[in-house]
Amino acid sequence: MGAKTYEGGDHHEDATNVLSTKSNAVGGKPRGANMLEDGDGEFGSDDDDDGGDGQDSSLAMVNPDDAAKPKKKKRSKKKKNNKKKSGAGAQRQTSPPRVPLSQLFPDGKYPIGQMVEVQDENLRRTTDEEFRYLSRGTITDDEALNDYRKAAEVHRQVRRWIHETIQPGSSLTELAVGIEDGVRALLEHQGLEPGDSLKGGMGFPTGLALNNCAAHYTPNPGQKDIILKTDDVLKIDFGVHVNGWIVDSAFTVTFDPVYDNLVAAVKDATNTGLKCAGVDARVGEIGGFIQEAMESYEVEINGKVYPVKSIRSITGHDILRYRVHGGKQVPFVKSNDQTKMEEGEVFAIETFGSTGKGYLRDGPGVYGYSKEPHAGNVHLPLASARALLKTINQNFGTIPFCRRYLDRLGIEKYLLGMNSLISHGIVQMYPPLVDIAGSYTAQFEHTILINSSGNEIISRGDDY
């Protein structure tokens, strides 16, 4: 989930093998590959466990002369028992995902994300004093780390279902509800009782942004349902939290290969940002590497070539407990921002690319809301506002939510109270973010845990 706002730097192509994923299979044309094509790159004005088979390998060494002995029967029985034992608890996830993770991982230990060894010695802490100074935050806490990994596994399993089922003709409302129902089922927190959704659930409303809408769109009550088309570019951005530790990850879905270069550009840029992240890395420099990777691509649409531009008005961000947007930002363009990443911090490294202007403005409608973390005690004259604030505190805290979530709780006639909370600075409203009409935008995002001994891309999967 991007946070609302830079040229230069060297781009290192796949600096580590460990970061090579199947994302690189998407072909990309560097800038200039289509010099013989027409087009000026503008859309116009803004006026518009690998398990075995359960067989004991030692049986292959049994002497054939022993076949007639009574022992064979006993050994055969043992083999059968072993085979049965190996299948015990080997439950598989359903589609749609509804088997709780507590049943799939009865030991309560969840898969580790992709570990990335620090390559630059200047980013490695070498003294005990420095390590003690920087060893703070969340990732040194084993319980919190396991919560992160649990949330990441839920994210992977739910998006696996998305990849299996999404197709032209899909309803965005049904897709959003399916994602959120899957997250709640796997975490065993339906969020219908006060406080339950604060133990585990959605980290923010499911983002389903189409085409020139880059971010912050979700289907809400009263809106006409949108049906996915073959020529659409869909960004799917959703968060999962366990005890307030939020995993924020996003990807782009297309059905027409004409958009392959756009997808490749953004995927490359995100992986570049992940490679550059680390203790003492400066966010302005990371933005430069991201921009160089992103803007080395171009895409041809309907015979016209467009450069892929890094979007400037939205950024990656650090993540705090129960707060998907912390105080630090990671731009997608080079800047002079000398802010450093520090030991123990968690970041959402995301990038957005566009065939349009590369600058987003507020679109019509409302994506969602969140309570301001530093909102003070304010007298609210409206009883509806006071009641709504109580509901927000009990069910969401500072986690973003949307109108669908309020309707799901049975809350009615809350718009007047919501407007009061917004006007008093207690609640923030998020509109959709759009580039110029006719343009296309793409997004990829991962959550990374910053550690001097090596970062963990907690949300990495076999899909991206």
From Swiss-Prot:
SUPFAM superfamilies found in the cross-reference section: Creatinase/aminopeptidase, Winged helix' DNA-binding domain
Q: Note the Gene3D superfamilies from the entry.
A: Creatinase/methionine aminopeptidase superfamily (3.90.230.10), Winged helix-like DNA-binding domain superfamily/Winged helix DNA-binding domain (1.10.10.10)
The reactions it catalyses are:
Release of N-terminal amino acids, preferentially methionine, from peptides and arylamides
Residues bound to substrate are: H216, H325
Where in the sequence does UniProt note compositional bias of the Acidic residues kind? 37-53
| Record's keyword terms, sorted | Aminopeptidase, Cytoplasm, Hydrolase, Metal-binding, Protease
Q: Which residues bind a divalent metal cation 1?
A: D237, D248, E445
Where, if anywhere, are coiled coils annotated? none
Q: Which GO terms describe its biological process?
A: proteolysis
Q: Where is the composition biased (Basic residues)?
A: 70-86
**Free-text remark on how the cofactor is bound:** Binds 2 divalent metal cations per subunit. Has a high-affinity and a low affinity metal-binding site. The true nature of the physiological cofactor is under debate. The enzyme is active with cobalt, zinc, manganese or divalent iron ions. Most likely, methionine aminopeptidases function as mononuclear Fe(2+)-metalloproteases under physiological conditions, and the catalytically relevant metal-binding site has been assigned to the histidine-containing high-affinity site.
Q: Which residues form the signal peptide?
A: none
Question: Mind telling me what this protein is named?
Answer: Methionine aminopeptidase 2-2
